[in-house]
């Protein structure tokens, strides 16, 4: 490696906010199933605290050795609805508390997997878990929850969509931070290292390490050097920069898996912003020539960014996975916040952007008097985009305050301006229930 590459890497870390966003250990809990929920909770606690005992120490050790910040150490587990279904319990809050206790014991930032997969209907544990979510998130600190309500192969479970509109409202009423730890998915992936949507899929190995990187500031700085040049040059610049960022993620993942003695899973090729100035996906899009994010051309700029990040990242890694694309959470990106505040970015434009990027309507504050059916309809719209386009989409929405208020979450979750929501009713649409069938192009066999 020549000296130019060394100084380039140092600048990425010191000046451009490059970091490894997360090392996430996925742990299967299938061997913790027990008909007695308290025994199951104890088995869960024991397995997590045994398998992930050294996760934080190893993460800190690698960060110090390489001089690269590793912001979060996290754990994801088998969807808890599968574990709880073996019991006769009428709620799974005790399992959420076991996860929380284990997370605190090992020192991780979050633990994901208080989850249910209901894209084609409810099994015994699913409805119990979904109804447990508001209390589970109110009575724990580190637990994250997700529900998959649709897939390209199965269509959209509209009964579950309606239920999740209600659950989001109940969660917001019970706690300030609960809704920030709850995601509703279509086409959820089994190897996602990012919260709040991470869970450990049943097809994964017993224990694995997945890595998520962050580097929008690095991409922006690279694009500053090619101002005014053609999109061919822009695309090549993003691709080469993504390769460098992702290569470091690959190295960190390999080191962590070797030292922890577990399999290395994937690097997630996502560009994840933070509220810090200089760490914004929105500012990358503006660097391409937009006056502000939300104006015409935003979706095209995002398409270029998303695709070139994948092209550069794929060559840098043995295995890629997770969500892999650009994240556009409003509260976690100072450029997105500014665009909402100046009126150039609204919910409808955000929805268009989600047809391109990873995830969907993420960390968006809406008025607290928004009906549950309207929230459910937002989920249905996002699910439709994901199901038809064969990609992951999601909703993490915060019904708090009144339009124009600023909702403060703190830390990586940032600050969200409360956005205007279309006031026309979707009640009759959502109350139908049932299943929206899978699209014709999903029928491949």
UniProtKB/Swiss-Prot annotation:
Q: Which SUPFAM superfamilies match?
A: PFL-like glycyl radical enzymes
Q: Where are the membrane-spanning stretches?
A: none
List the CDD domains hit by this protein, alphabetically. Answer: RNR_PFL_like_DUF711 (cd08025)
Could you tell me which Pfam families the record lists for this protein? DUF711
Which superkingdom, per the lineage?
Answer: Bacteria
InterPro entries (UniProt xref): UPF0210
PANTHER family for the chain: UPF0210 PROTEIN MJ1665, UPF0210 PROTEIN SPR0218
Per the similarity annotation, which family is this?
Belongs to the UPF0210 family.
**Quaternary structure and partners:** Homodimer.
Q: Which NCBIfam families match?
A: PRK05313.1
Protein name per its UniProtKB record: UPF0210 protein spr0218
**Taxonomic source organism:** Streptococcus pneumoniae (strain ATCC BAA-255 / R6)
